[in-house]
Swiss-Prot record:
Pfam families: Mo25
Record GO biological process: intracellular signal transduction
Segments passing through the bilayer: none
Name recorded for this polypeptide: MO25-like protein 3
Recorded family membership: Belongs to the Mo25 family.
Length: 339
């Protein structure tokens, strides 16, 4: 039934679409895919071990999850078949993470890449359904991702950090991000991954740490951890970023990222967010200062305080000396003068 459904694609050239072709299923075929949902669940659960089958399976899953009911059936799977007989210990989503944690079975990067592509297809097609699944299974989901970012396979580490970065930057996952980033164990894993000798792991981990630094409402434990290790992180980023410009190479890009992180840590405010009373006092003081400046009761410029100096417009023009390589001919200094 499943092969019949897949071969019923309305492409005029071939009965079975190619791996990279864009499938166009009719509503009737979508209904047949929903009836084949248990077969799809078995495919997601078993996975693939050959690079040649990755694109074929991901095309099927990509088309399957476009329907909300089909996607919900993946998230609600608990190991039962169509006859409600328990033939698996867990759902198909957790089987994907279990395969990633068993790194001894992976010998090809294409298989790992295809597995993370499957996760991206499932979790980022419908953010609402994925967010409900994560919130209902948040402790286990956090523990699973923590194991992946702490594993010995650097490729799985980098892909796990990328998955978390896309998950945190989605606006619909605000509540999940807040609960997740309140855990002090998570930021410790991120800081540990920054010291990795793999460029892909370091760059992804720094992106996650940047979210921590920009968050004004960190938990007290996370806030204390950043404040206690702030100087160490600043010294690490400055020592790791000897180049403070970017001209396109990957090393210079990483140096620019490290320099930006050191600058943000230098400007990081260690005070807690303002209370309502402190915010009101600040606004009153700012309004009073603004009124005084408008009435010219406070002189803000040295020239205004000294009436003997001529008035200036505070616009300073500087002439940049041109680079010698852009001149038409080199500079000529002539012969030295002899007495």
């Amino acid at each position: 039934m499943f092969i019949t459904t897949w071969c019923s694609n309305d492409a005029p050239d071939s009965s079975v679409p190619r791996t990279r072709s864009k499938t166009k299923f009719t509503p009737k075929v979508r209904d047949l895919l929903f009836h084949c949902r248990y077969e799809i669940v078995d495919i997601v659960d078993e996975g693939y071990d050959m690079p040649a089958s990755i694109g074929f399976y991901n095309d099927i899953i990509r088309e399957f999850v476009t329907d909300d009911f089909c996607l919900t059936s993946l998230f609600e799977d608990n190991g039962q078949d169509s006859n409600n007989i328990q033939h698996r210990n867990d759902g198909c989503i957790w089987s994907i993470f279990d395969r990633l944690m068993n790194t001894n079975k992976f010998r090809d990067f294409d298989v790992i890449q295809g597995t993370f592509d499957t996760l991206q297809i499932i979790f980022f097609t419908n953010h609402e359904s994925a967010n409900n699944f994560i919130k209902n299974n948040l402790p286990r989901f956090m523990q699973t991702l923590h194991k992946l970012i702490a594993c010995s396979n650097f490729f799985i580490q980098a892909k796990s950090f990328k998955f978390l970065n896309e998950l945190f930057t989605a606006q619909t996952n605000y509540e999940t991000r807040s609960l997740w980033m309140a855990e002090p164990a998570f930021i410790k894993l991120v800081v540990l991954a920054i010291q990795s000798n793999k460029h892909a792991v370091r760059s992804r981990a720094v992106s996650i740490l940047e979210i921590f630094i920009r968050n004004p409402r960190n938990s007290p434990e996370v806030h204390e951890f950043i404040g206690r290790n702030r100087n160490v992180l600043i010294a690490f980023f400055f020592n790791s970023a000897p180049i403070h410009y970017y001209q396109g190479s990957p090393n210079e890009k990483e140096d620019a990222q490290y320099a930006r992180m050191a600058y943000k840590l230098l400007n990081w405010d260690m005070q807690r967010p303002f209370t309502q009373e402190q915010l009101q006092d600040f606004e009153e003081g700012w309004t009073h200062q603004k009124k005084m400046r408008e009435e010219q009761l406070v002189r803000t410029c040295f020239h205004d305080n000294n009436p003997r100096l001529p008035k200036v417009n505070h616009v300073y023009r500087t002439r940049i000396i041109p680079n010698q390589q852009f001149l038409r001919e080199p500079l000529k200094f002539g012969n030295p003068f002899r007495q």
